[in-house]
Amino acid sequence: MNRAILIVAHGSREKPAQQEFKRLVGKYRQRHPGWKIAHAFLEMAEPSIPQALESLAVTSSEILVLPLFLFTAKHVRQHIPEILTAFRKKHPGAKVKLGKPLGADPQLLDILDKRLRHLS
C-alpha cells in the first residue's frame, strides 16, 4: 500500500506564519526521509486540503491526515471531516484516515515549562 501523510494547519494570510509551518513540515520530512509527507492549510493559504488530497491521491492509496491543531474544536470535529467525506465520495477507492489533534498530550506540559523558563 502506498501511504502518504498530510499535515494540516489552520492557515494564515501572513507569509511568515505560512513559512513557519512549511519549515516544521520540512523538518518532519527530514526525520522520516522515506515517507511521503505533504502539507495543507484549512483556510487562507494554499495548498488547500482538497488540493493536497488530489495531489497525493495520484500516487497514494492511503492518506493519513494529521491535524496540527491543539484541541478538538469545530475545525477538527466538523470542517476537516466534511472535506475528507467529500474527497472520499469523489475517490471511493481512496483510504483516508484523520488523526487526533495534539490535545492534552503530557509533552505539551514540558513545552509550557520550557517556554516559562525562557521568560524567567
Feature-to-residue mapping (PLM):
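Active-site-proximal alpha-helix that buttresses catalytic centers in soluble enzyme cores
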Residues: 1-120
